[in-house]
Design a protein with these regions (language model features):
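Phosphate-group recognition and catalysis centered on beta-loop-alpha active-site segments
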Residues: 1-334
């Protein structure tokens, strides 16, 4: 289990979302190391697989937006169109590359027009494997003299399984080999797909299991299995939906849009059932703030983020994902 139980309700866990991507390209070594130095309780790697079954950290399996793959002529013929979780995407996909091939790529800032300073670090760092991040956090815990956790997000599990890349056993093996499966350091496993969470829990990995919740739509794994009979995400956070999660998961992680909906009772309803509530993602830039909290200037300028975050904090959340860990630590612990 994670150590959220020991943290007061007015002091949620501060989780570095993909490291510290407000300052460095997401999922880069420097992004994670900066997040640890800024005092986060945990960092969040998103996990996808390569053709040869190596687990790497990327927000999605299509990598043209966050790497220089398009600049590699040797990979030009890998560009293709696929349907991932029901959506048609064109680009380059991790499952079409070996780890050795992907290790030749360099990371880029996803949103250079919003985060120009982060983009100045483009081209300097390699893609990381999950094992790399686990080792960075273990070493960082020793260096900084405190327990730091990992919130591992499993991406596109149903899709990868359809390709013969079953993520549950790959993750299980990686965590055990890295010394992260038996509670050595705080671990959360999260996904928008409940099926893979159940599979990992059945394997006996010591972790908190958190069900990710979008503001709209249905989970892809349940949509494949049940069609339109599958519960929507909104139905899942209603009282009856939360009842069905008790005993299966330790909590939920909801889009901040749901908590900014005035009058919602999601946190109170979940807490009444013994479920923790995390939320994602608190960012200070106008591009990501609700309209009422945006300030003057462009999309990359900071708006009245503290006012937005206050609406969320007052609801008693247990964990919050942030892109600027220094701001998150100062606000949510202050």
């Amino acid at each position: 289990m994670f150590y959220a139980e020991s943290v007061p309700r007015n002091s949620p866990l501060v989780i570095g979302h993909r490291g510290a991507p407000g300052y460095r390209p997401e999922h880069s070594r420097s992004s994670y190391e900066l997040a640890l130095a800024m005092g986060v309780d945990a960092v969040e790697p998103d996990v996808v697989a390569t053709k040869d079954g190596v687990l790497i950290v990327r927000h999605e399996n299509e990598i043209s937006g966050t790497t220089d793959v398009a600049d590699h002529p040797e990979f030009a013929d890998r560009k293709t169109t696929k349907r991932v979780d029901g959506d048609a995407l064109t680009g380059w996909f991790t499952e079409d590359f070996t780890w050795a091939e992907l290790s030749t790529l360099r990371i880029r800032e996803r949103l250079p027009e919003v985060r120009a300073s982060s983009a100045s670090f483009d081209g300097a760092q390699q893609i990381l494997r999950l094992r790399d991040v686990l080792d960075i956090v273990r070493e960082g815990s020793t260096e900084h003299g405190r327990e730091i956790g990992v919130v591992l997000e499993v991406k596109h599990a149903t899709y990868f399984a359809s390709l013969g890349l079953d993520l549950a056993p790959l993750i299980d093996q990686e965590l055990r080999e890295a010394g992260w499966a038996a509670g050595e350091l705080p671990l959360v496993i999260e996904s928008f797909e409940s099926t893979v969470l159940g599979q990992l829990r059945e394997r006996g990995i010591s972790a908190s299991y958190i069900y990710l919740i979008e503001a709209s739509g249905r989970p892809y794994d349940l949509l494949v299995a049940e069609g339109k009979r599958a519960l929507t995400y909104k139905e899942t956070v209603a009282p009856k939906g939360l009842d069905a999660l008790v005993g299966r998961f330790d909590g939920i992680s909801v889009s901040k849009k749901m908590l900014l909906d005035r009058g919602n009772t999601i946190v109170a309803d979940a807490h009444a059932r013994g479920l923790q509530v995390f939320t994602w993602t608190c960012r200070p830039e106008n591009a990501f703030l609700a309209a009422e909290f945006r300030g003057a200037g462009g999309r990359g300028e900071f708006g009245d983020y503290e006012a937005e975050w206050s609406v969320i904090a007052r609801q008693g959340i247990d964990g919050v994902f942030v892109d600027h860990p220094d701001l998150g630590v100062a606000f949510f612990r202050g």
